[in-house]
């Protein structure tokens, strides 16, 4: 245990470097925050962000929604008034996520200040804001930034020894909301449990502490039940049985992995791009372990609580969805160890080594901020995505059903499955031709070929294929879909513009041709394009004329040889102003 004299001596020695270091670290931290806004306005929108936005529009449109992990939708219905363009709506949502990230930074600072200096606390927050994946994706429109902020408030509460019943109730509510927003909040449970056990063992009032933790736990359970019930009955939800099944399936899918370290590729990448971060983290862990035994820098209780934060790193070994965006969620509490590393360097290292540490590491963080906050968003911008969606709304000014990867046109009704790795694995496991079913029953008018899963439409041949360096880390060209779904897409859609395919048919006639029979699954007006006229069920259909076709079989023939195109819509608009400069999605 530290004596008062030891603490005073350490504080006085730390005061010598406090003003300058705090100023420099604060300036870098301010730059990192400014960078967040640049990233929000410029960086390419990820497929997940469109997916989360689509839940908001499903609530607005009164569509059925799975109540599992969709609690966030109640707070973002105002996005519909920001713009008709989904990219602009996501930018507005990203700005809200920045606020939550700033709140998370404040929680990290407050946690650090329980044991460490001001400079150490600022250094820890800077480490969090400078981590490469966090710079680019920490404030993206996902549920993670909200849940991270809420659970960090609760973690700060648990770390403190002075507990009150009011704080226990409030933090229980916040934790319940975090769990409703995303199930991955449960990954914090080992850290919470170890912290509670350490506090319980060393507290002088075990009965009082146990009572407050019991209130906290009960508050979580009661709040979760009440808020989930309100959420379920507010939305047009699926059956409660389906929701429970989704929850159990998600838990099994994400944690019950046969593969050890399922996202090693991204961690390996981080070891290279953020090597300074991981070195300092190891140093912080080492100082915490050392202090646990000699109690020089911090006492044993604090050391054990700080080491409990490292347990979250273990989730990388098992958690299936440890993609780059996950690191901002996982590393928030872990970054508290950076304050230990900073103060430990002042305490244990020589003046020369300490000076080297305090210059080189912040410099590496500065490089990460510039590269990931300015260079990456400048190279991978959202401009083409915004222009593409703007043209889609011009082509289809009224909402229609469609098929794509991730609900990119979020305000319209997407059909089919969410084409992430998880969604694709479930699709293959079920073996149900859901796309064929959607085409036959939901009248999807167009397809946005924004994933390699839709290569069957001939995206590669048109040289507009999407980047395969996404969740897979690379993939070979092949027919990804079930045979029935592939045939349904090829026989019902034709290329229209860039990555857009619309309902239609291409008919070939020779002079020897007799009657052809075609099947229309997607009803609506069709324009006949070509140099020849045809007979449709015995009636002349001249080139450039528009005719409404209902679902069903039709007999077609032509007196002349040639090719005609039946394209959905009345002379459907085709943009000439927007050129494709890149794929719609280029990966993380």
Describe the role of every protein-language-model region:
Residues 35, 212-257, 273-280, 318:
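Membrane-lumen/periplasm interface segments of specific transmembrane helices
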Residues 40-55, 66-82, 87-91, 238-240, ...:
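Extracytoplasmic catalytic/substrate-binding loops of multi-pass membrane glycan-assembly enzymes
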Residues 74, 78, 86-106, 137, ...:
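Loop-to-helix entry region of an early transmembrane alpha helix in multi-pass inner-membrane enzymes
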Residues 104-108, 197, 274-299, 305-313:
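Hydrophobic, aromatic-rich transmembrane alpha-helices
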Residues 108-130, 148-149, 166, 303:
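Transmembrane-helix signature of polytopic, membrane-embedded enzymes
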Residues 113-118, 152-170, 200-204, 286-300, ...:
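Membrane-interface transmembrane helices that cradle and orient dolichyl/undecaprenyl
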Residues 137, 144-147, 187-188, 313-350:
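Hydrophobic/aromatic-rich transmembrane helices and adjacent perimembrane loops
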Residues 185, 365-508, 530-553:
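Extracytoplasmic
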């Amino acid at each position: 245990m530290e004596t008062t004299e030891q603490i005073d001596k350490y504080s006085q020695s730390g005061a010598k470097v406090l003003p300058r270091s705090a100023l420099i670290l604060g300036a870098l931290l301010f730059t990192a925050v400014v960078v967040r806004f640049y990233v929000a306005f410029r960086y390419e929108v990820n497929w997940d962000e469109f997916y989360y936005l689509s839940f908001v529009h499903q609530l607005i449109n009164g569509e059925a929604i799975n109540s599992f992990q969709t609690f966030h939708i109640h707070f973002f219905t105002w996005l519909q008034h920001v713009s008709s363009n989904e990219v602009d709506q996501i930018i507005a949502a990203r700005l809200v996520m920045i606020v939550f990230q700033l709140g998370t930074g404040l929680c990290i600072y407050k946690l650090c200040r329980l044991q460490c200096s001001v400079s150490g606390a600022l250094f820890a927050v800077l480490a969090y804001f400078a981590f490469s994946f966090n710079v680019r994706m920490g404030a993206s429109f996902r549920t993670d930034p909200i849940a991270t902020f809420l659970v960090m408030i609760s973690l700060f509460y648990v770390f403190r020894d002075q507990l009150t019943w009011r704080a226990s109730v409030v933090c229980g509510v916040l934790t319940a909301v975090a769990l409703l927003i995303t199930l991955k909040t449960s990954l914090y449970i080992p850290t919470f449990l170890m912290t509670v056990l350490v506090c319980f063992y060393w507290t002088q009032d075990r009965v009082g502490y146990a009572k407050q933790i019991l209130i906290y736990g009960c508050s979580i359970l009661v709040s979760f039940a009440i808020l989930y019930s309100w959420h379920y009955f507010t939305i047009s939800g699926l059956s409660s049985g389906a929701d429970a099944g989704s929850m159990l399936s998600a838990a099994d899918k994400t944690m019950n992995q046969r593969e050890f370290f399922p996202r090693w590729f991204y961690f390996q990448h981080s070891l290279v791009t953020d090597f300074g971060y991981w070195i300092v983290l190891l140093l912080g862990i080492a100082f915490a372990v050392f202090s646990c035994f000699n109690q020089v820098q911090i006492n044993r209780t604090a050391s054990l609580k700080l080491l409990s934060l490292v347990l979250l790193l273990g989730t990388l070994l098992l958690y299936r969805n440890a993609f780059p965006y996950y690191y901002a969620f996982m590393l928030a509490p872990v970054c508290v160890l950076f304050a230990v590393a900073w103060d430990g360097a002042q305490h244990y290292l020589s003046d020369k080594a300490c000076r080297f540490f305090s210059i080189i590491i912040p410099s590496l963080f500065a490089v990460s901020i510039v590269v990931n906050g300015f260079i990456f968003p400048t190279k991978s911008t959202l401009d083409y995505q915004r222009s593409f969606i703007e043209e889609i709304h011009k082509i289809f000014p009224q909402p229609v059903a469609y098929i794509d990867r991730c609900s990119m046109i979020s305000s319209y009704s997407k059909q089919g499955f969410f084409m992430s790795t998880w969604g694709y694995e479930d699709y293959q496991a079920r073996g149900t031709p859901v796309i064929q079913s959607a085409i036959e029953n939901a009248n999807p008018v167009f397809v946005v070929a924004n994933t390699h899963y839709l290569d069957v439409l001939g995206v590669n041949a048109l040289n507009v294929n999407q980047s395969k360096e996404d969740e897979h880390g690379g993939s070979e060209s092949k027919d990804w879909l079930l045979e029935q779904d592939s045939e349904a897409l090829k026989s019902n859609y034709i290329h229209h513009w860039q990555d857009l395919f619309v309902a239609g048919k291409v008919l070939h006639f020779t002079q020897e041709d007799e009657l052809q029979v075609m099947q229309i699954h997607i009803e609506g007006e069709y324009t006949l394009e070509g140099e020849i006229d045809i007979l449709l069920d015995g009636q002349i259909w001249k080139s450039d004329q528009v005719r409404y076709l209902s679902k069903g079989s039709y007999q077609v023939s032509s007196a002349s040889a040639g090719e005609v195109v039946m394209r959905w819509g009345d002379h459907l608009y085709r943009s000439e102003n927007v050129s494709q400069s890149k794929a719609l999605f280029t990966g993380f």
